[in-house]
């Protein structure tokens, strides 16, 4: 129930499909990027800028973003709270 999340440069992901947002600095994540690239599941949406976060989806896709993981996480939380506000309003109207 996270809606659509802006991950920078006009790129959007479906929040409910994301399973992890991680920093790309560790060696295991660098290997994960290579594997995703070999499988055709790497999406680079950083417009040539330094990759600051990998977004891993439930379909096995790895999305490289130039936005910090903390910023993307904050966007997730804000979307969640916004959706909850709307749902609370609807619940009150129904009852």
Curated annotation (Swiss-Prot):
Pfam families: RemA-like
InterPro entries, A to Z: RemA-like
Family: Belongs to the RemA family.
Name listed for the protein in its UniProt record: Putative regulatory protein Pmob_0099
UniProt lineage: Bacteria, Thermotogati, Thermotogota, Thermotogae, Petrotogales
């Amino acid at each position: 129930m996270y809606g659509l999340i802006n991950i920078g440069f006009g790129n959007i992901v479906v929040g409910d499909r994301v399973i992890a947002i991680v920093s790309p600095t560790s060696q295991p994540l660098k290997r994960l990027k290579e594997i995703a690239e070999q499988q055709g599941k790497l999406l680079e949406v950083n417009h040539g800028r330094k990759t600051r976060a990998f977004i891993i989806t439930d379909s096995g896709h790895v999305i490289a973003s130039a936005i910090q993981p903390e910023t993307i996480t904050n966007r997730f939380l804000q979307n969640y709270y916004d959706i909850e506000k709307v749902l609370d309003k609807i619940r009150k109207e129904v009852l």
